[in-house]
Amino acid sequence: MVDYQGKKVVIIGLGLTGLSCVDFFIARGVTPRVMDTRINPPGLDQLPESVEQHVGDLNQEWLLDADLIVVSPGMALAHPALSEAAEAGVEIIGDIELFCRENQAPVVAITGSNGKSTVTTLVGEMAKAAGWSVGVGGNIGVPALTLLKQDNQLTVLELSSFQLETTHSLRASAATILNVTEDHTDRYPLGLQQYRAAKLRVYENAKVCIVNADDALTMPVRGADSRCISFGVDVGDYHLNKQQGEIWLRVRGEKVLNTREMKLSGRHNYTNALAALALADAVGIPRASSLKALTTFSGLPHRFQLVLERHGVRWINDSKATNVGSTEAALDGLQVDGTLHLLLGGDGKSADFSGLTRFLQGDRIKVYCFGRDGGQLAALRPDVSQLTETMAQAMALVAKVVLPGDRVLLSPACASLDQFRSFEHRGNEFARLAEELG
């Protein structure tokens, strides 16, 4: 534990995480200053009167006067104001680093381009099924510092690459990178390897590394084979096995669960289940409890979520697919009796969409593209694509042609902020329109 008494602390970024940082320092007798580049950030009205605040931009004088800056994951470390502070010797960390310095419970740490929230929640459910007290948070739901107030046997953290950049003291009992696909190109101008390097920090000082046998980018750079356990579709310590039309989860050759017993569907979710099972095994959660959780967990909203089944048509909300890799995962191995009606579009974040082309083949797919980068997506296969301005217009086109046996899938491969408040807002609108049009 670190003594912060007498330290001049600046917190950048409010919201739930920023407020948890304020509470953390006040509880330790330190009154921080707070700044946010937004004029009216969430949580501003909840700050104690003793806390000085600066909104609308960054206060460089405060930053250079600080001993410690706790920065929101949403603020790039490459920002000139932060670069100047770092060069002046000011320590810059994030809330996860604060958590790691204080935490006493074993930690399961989960990162990756796609599937993080599902696997994080699933490991938490496995621990609960075993009767363990468990805290689940980080980049999902509850801020990590809030979990410090709980007396948990296990902490399960979802960690983004941005959070890992400012974390130095993580010592996970088990850590995984689920996958690495192009994302956040605006924050990683040097490309995929720069993004991967941030993800790889999750393995530092980890007792066990859980790696994806199908994705070499998830492997530790330095030799850590003795600490590595793998999962994958066909290969890996934890893998899938198809027999007589049924798919089983297998661990080192032993069949442990028929996927028919799971509420989750889709090959990407089966590999998520394998990763969660490997993590749970690594920290000693009884296998029977983990398998029980796999049969009851129905998934998270906006993640390949069935929102309507009517007249033989299934409408699936995968709005959380905010990058190409996530949409590829949704489409990989997807089987549809009739025609797949795929909705793509939004803000592509300068991504390369060409990887989607192989999933858009055949005559049983129709593509509906919308939003800022809809034109680029429609160009992948113009003969089966229609371009509209909005998702609502695209869904109106879908509703005119769907037939029993068809599937309508919103898996946009793009961020939502060009037309929606969040991916949740986009997903809720999809569900509302499906109910209206289906």
UniProtKB/Swiss-Prot annotation:
A molecular function (GO) term: ATP binding
One annotated GO biological process: cell wall organization
Assigned keywords, A-Z: ATP-binding, Cell cycle, Cell division, Cell shape, Cell wall biogenesis/degradation, Cytoplasm, Ligase, Nucleotide-binding, Peptidoglycan synthesis
This protein's pathway: Cell wall biogenesis; peptidoglycan biosynthesis
Compartments, record wording: Cytoplasm
Keyword Transferase in record: no
Catalyzed reaction equations: UDP-N-acetyl-alpha-D-muramoyl-L-alanine + D-glutamate + ATP = UDP-N-acetyl-alpha-D-muramoyl-L-alanyl-D-glutamate + ADP + phosphate + H(+)
Superkingdom of the organism of origin: Bacteria
Name under which the protein is recorded: UDP-N-acetylmuramoylalanine--D-glutamate ligase
Function of the protein: Cell wall formation. Catalyzes the addition of glutamate to the nucleotide precursor UDP-N-acetylmuramoyl-L-alanine (UMA).
HAMAP family documented for this protein: MurD (MF_00639)
InterPro entries: Mur-like_cat_sf, Mur_ligase_C, Mur_ligase_C_dom_sf, Mur_ligase_cen, MurD
Similarity comment: family membership: Belongs to the MurCDEF family.
A single GO cellular-component term on record: cytoplasm
